[in-house]
Regions:
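Acidic/His-rich, metal-assisted hydrolase cores and their charged scaffolds
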Residues: 1-273
Length: 273
């Protein structure tokens, strides 16, 4: 609520790069609470746009499969006749024309769009229209992989290239910690401890290098398991439990989505929209 209030007070837009399935709906849940509890009395009727065809479809799936998609807290709201991810001022953009019109509207608003790491999809258009604005804010609500545009912005990039144009970053860049679709260290430790048949080998294959190696050491110290965080290309024989090949230890520079051929990029954009 503080981020929204500060942005709207400046007269800017709040742009939220979010994964279409799960994270977008989670943001809608939080924003509904902000509106319902009147946490922004100075901006009570602000509009929220979902600008992602996949996110719109996923949200419809949530509406149509209530018992499968919501937790106990949300089900209590539903039992009371409250839709946990729907509220006054919620708008959706499906067509490209609807998407373009969002940026013609000068009123301060919240824009939720994909992809969550800003590598493709309509979010890149909204970044182009808002990054140069000192009154706007980009709020990251998910992990940003090194090499992605989202990672660059979150780590202080002063200029970025979008659609062949260099954009100066003047908007406020904010990270919302504590929101993750993954289990944390304690939850993973608890899960490993519940395994009845002790694994012969544990591979830590997700996360940044230092974090993965630290967790592998934690697993070994806690359970005595043979744990390792392999590099890309490392090969292990799962029968003999031996390492048979070393992968690359060099950091591979990530190729941006806009470097793809036209047809490949079109397909990629549709998948992450």
């Amino acid at each position: 609520a503080k981020v929204i209030n500060a942005t709207f007070t400046r007269g800017g837009n709040l742009v939220i790069p979010a994964f279409s399935v799960g994270r977008t709906q989670e943001m809608l849940y939080f924003i509904r609470r902000i509106k319902t509890e009147n946490l922004l009395p100075e901006h009570p009727n602000f509009e929220v746009y979902i600008d992602s065809p996949l996110a719109v479809e996923a949200t419809n799936v949530f509406h149509e499969n209530i018992s499968d998609c919501f937790d106990e807290e949300a089900m209590e709201l539903i039992s009371a006749g409250i839709n946990p991810i729907k509220f006054p001022g919620l708008r959706v953009a499906v067509s490209s024309d609807e998407s373009k019109m969002i940026n013609f509207d000068k009123k301060p608003k919240v824009i939720i769009s994909a992809s969550g790491m800003c590598e493709a999809g309509r979010i890149r258009h909204h970044l182009k229209h808002n990054l140069w604005r000192s009154d706007s804010t980009v709020l990251f609500v998910g992990y940003q992989v090194p090499g992605t545009l989202g990672y660059a912005l979150l780590n202080g990039a002063k200029k970025v290239k979008l659609f062949g144009e260099e954009i100066e970053v003047r908007a406020s860049i904010v990270n919302l910690p504590g929101i993750s679709g993954h289990a944390d260290k304690n939850q993973l430790t608890e899960w490993l401890g519940a395994i009845k048949n002790k694994p012969e080998h544990v591979f830590i294959v997700h996360g940044e290098e230092s974090t993965a190696e630290s967790f592998a050491n934690h697993v070994h110290e806690t359970f005595g398991y043979d744990a390792v965080a392999p590099y890309s290309g490392d090969a292990y024989d799962l029968i003999t439990n031996q390492k048979v090949a070393d992968g690359s230890r060099k950091l591979v520079e990530k190729k941006a989505a806009y470097g793809m051929a036209s047809r490949e990029k079109t397909i990629f954009d549709r998948l992450v929209a």
